[in-house]
Design a protein with these regions (language model features):
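Short surface loop/edge beta-strand patches of beta-sandwich-type extracellular domains
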Residues: 35-49, 92-111, 170-176
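Flexible glycan-contacting loops in extracellular carbohydrate-active proteins
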Residues: 210-253
């Protein structure tokens, strides 16, 4: 009887040890490791979207470097701030950055420009995230700006010169509801074959505008791209056509993830870019 008890006790111990080992293994199992990657439009990361057509990308990760050309913009008072994806560029009153465009940008025909902005209302004047300088004209070769700013909405206007500067286009003044103090993804596409512009906010098409005879954007002679204000608000002004305007101001908030492509992204690609960057991917 004594010997039987001795035989049973080690057996019970072995069963208990095996059970504990199994439980331990089960606790370490992570079902997420088997889950497929989340994708949008077939992309798992924002850098995958139309990657071969990307001609400029400012991630603003502690610097003002375009990762495509590996050249930096000149800083005029901007600083680092939390962005939609990592760090962003804090602009603020009187501040901006200036980038000398590469040949890839100057030679654009069809194109997309997309970026994020998070800014409060500016009661002093228009806020211009991006301005492609035209040194001989009041307005730049491309201007994108918040105008008609109200507490619950803003008109967003876009102006461009095309066809060697012979044609000038003011796109429809689209209204954005509740645009302040939150991240907005803005994207403008242009297909030169159809001469059609499309404007997206947070991945959703807001409207289109066909400009007959517009041709290629007038970027061949653009000397600089201003990020954070209009070409005539820099110090000194970048155009001989005018000086500072009292109805114009600066982006007061943060910009992030500015990308320029040499094609008109599809609606699906714009949506994918918005979704992925919004998730920090």
């Amino acid at each position: 009887m004594y010997n039987n008890k001795l035989t049973i006790k080690p057996a019970i111990f072995l069963v208990a040890a095996f059970t504990l080992a199994m439980v331990s293994c089960q606790k370490k199992f992570d079902p997420k490791s088997y889950a497929p990657k989340q994708t949008f439009g077939g992309y798992a990361a924002s850098n995958e979207v139309a990657a071969s057509d990307l001609v400029a990308h400012f991630a603003f990760e502690g610097n003002l470097v375009d990762s495509v050309s590996n050249t930096a913009a000149t800083n005029n008072g901007t600083s680092n701030s939390p962005g939609i994806k990592g760090q962003g560029m804090q602009v603020g009153e009187g501040n901006y950055a200036v980038f000398t465009p590469t040949d890839a940008i100057k030679n654009l025909q069809s194109m997309t420009i997309a970026y994020w902005v998070n800014t409060p209302i500016n009661t002093k004047g228009i806020q211009t995230p991006v301005s492609f300088v035209n040194p001989d004209q009041f307005w730049g070769n491309m201007d994108m700006f918040f105008d008609g700013q109200a507490s619950d909405k803003s008109v967003f206007k876009m102006h461009l010169f095309g066809n060697g500067g012979a044609n000038e286009a003011w796109l429809a003044a689209w209204s954005i509801a509740s645009p302040w103090d939150k991240w907005l993804h803005l994207a403008l596409t242009y297909d030169m074959t159809s001469e059609k512009f499309a404007f997206y906010v947070n991945g959703t098409l807001v409207g289109t505008s066909t400009q007959a005879g517009f041709g290629a954007p007038n970027f061949a002679t653009v000397p600089a791209i201003v990020m954070g204000t209009a070409q005539f608000q820099t110090n000194p002004t970048m155009t001989s056509a005018t000086d500072h305007q009292d109805w114009a101001s600066f982006v007061l908030g943060v910009m992030d993830e500015l990308r320029i492509y040499k094609k008109a992204l599809t609606a699906d690609d714009v949506k994918a870019l918005y979704n992925l960057e919004n998730l920090g991917k």
